[in-house]
Amino acid sequence: MFGRNFPFFNSIGGFYPRESLDSKRPSGTGYTSKVRVRDKYHIVGFISSGTYGRVYKAIGKDGRKGEYAIKKFKPDKEGEIIQYTGLSQSAIREMALCSELDHPNVVQLAEIILEDKCIFMVFEYTEHDLLQIIHHHTQPQRHAIPAPMIKSILFQLLNGLLYLHTNWVLHRDLKPANILVTSSGAVRIGDLGLARLFYKPLNSLYSGDKVVVTIWYRAPELLMGSRHYTPAVDLWAVGCIFAELLSLRPIFKGEEAKMDSKKTVPFQRNQMMKIIDIMGLPRKETWPGLVSMPEFSQLQSLAMSRGYLNRQCNLEGWYQSCLKNNGYSPGSAAGTPGAEGFDLLSRLLEYDPTKRISAREALEHPYFTTGTPVTANCFAGYEGKYPHRRVTQDDNDIRSGSLPGTKRSGLPDDSLMGRAAKRLKE
């Protein structure tokens, strides 16, 4: 299914051969036992922690050049007693998929190490992520993200997504924090903990994971309770990311309703309202499958109570306002995403998943094939500097015997969700 020679799609319809791209990963990535992490890597410091465990920055020893991010999974814990009852489904999926996937726009796994009942995933180190980049541009006296940089980021993201979808992999959690960027401007899709194969599933995708995709990037068919879904859910998330790169804030910033004690998934009323405010009310005339959605009656109730029955799409108004407020040049000049950018955004944010643009179609869109050429380095031509990822020396004990921790004072708790939660309060 997967292959190390999968081609790299380019903007003029050709392919870059995989062999021409540098990779730190040796062939046949798999599990390594009877070896200690510290024998192969020098631990520089601690990056972040979360429900999965902890992440550390490291440098290779004994001829292993380069920097690495080591994810240490923590075992189940009951009180002060660690119970080695196995790994989460998320960890197993991530290890299985990352061991097979190999593409320049998907995060690279170097190896997996088993040490004294602890599992370590060793990834290439990436200095930035899109959430960090977006946050940098929101600070006073800073400008919008340059249009050529957005084009390169989006192209590389779609290129990696095409590889995943071609190999029957749904990511299911695309968001700025999970889109990594190397110091040389290469974009990598990261965090495959919610990813899964969708080729001839034995059960509906809903039966395995009832809640997927962070709420601000969740596709309308998921909000409407669809029991089965397609790669189109990832393309909606790409549209949300595209909009966020342009506006420097989430386009659909709703509040998530949590599951009750019976683990019943509630209708995400507030998030659906945020989408309708910009996209208008979805209608069965343009989305025939809408009426069969489990939450259709909830949508009707929402439309009646909020006066949404005649709400029309205002995405173009939002787009033009965004360009004006962020100082992009009018028209289709090199310094603006232009009309082609709006057309691509509208196709990504299509309500009906059967009509939503695919990754392959998006890569062939005029937004990429006309105007300023796409660069392989998204930072090309940008004179500014982004801050390095925070690495602390306060807690860099990666030993398997050390107790895997959770949140600690002064340290980020799950950088992927913690920063998003902070922005929700703003």
From Swiss-Prot:
What sort of enzyme, by top EC class, is this? Answer: transferase
User: Which residues carry out catalysis?
Assistant: D173
Could you tell me where this protein is found in the cell? Nucleus
Q: Does the keyword Nucleus apply?
A: yes
Q: What SUPFAM superfamilies does the record tag this protein with?
A: Protein kinase-like (PK-like)
Protein residues bound to ATP = I47, S48, S49, G50, T51, Y52, G53, R54, V55, K71
The record, for CDD domains, names: STKc_CDK8_like
- Give the UniProt keywords, A-Z: Activator, ATP-binding, Kinase, Magnesium, Metal-binding, Nucleotide-binding, Nucleus, Repressor, Serine/threonine-protein kinase, Transcription, Transcription regulation, Transferase
Catalysed reaction per UniProt? L-seryl-[protein] + ATP = O-phospho-L-seryl-[protein] + ADP + H(+); L-threonyl-[protein] + ATP = O-phospho-L-threonyl-[protein] + ADP + H(+); [DNA-directed RNA polymerase] + ATP = phospho-[DNA-directed RNA polymerase] + ADP + H(+)
Q: Sorted alphabetically, which Gene3D superfamilies does this protein's record hold?
A: Phosphorylase Kinase, domain 1, Transferase(Phosphotransferase) domain 1
Cofactor(s) demanded: Mg(2+)
Where do the record's region annotations for Disordered lie? 390-426
Pfam families, alphabetized: Pkinase
Query: Assembly state and interactors?
Result: Component of the srb8-11 complex, a regulatory module of the Mediator complex.
Question: What does the similarity note say?
Answer: Belongs to the protein kinase superfamily. CMGC Ser/Thr protein kinase family. CDC2/CDKX subfamily.
What is the name of this protein? Serine/threonine-protein kinase ssn3
| Lineage of source species | Eukaryota, Fungi, Dikarya, Ascomycota, Pezizomycotina
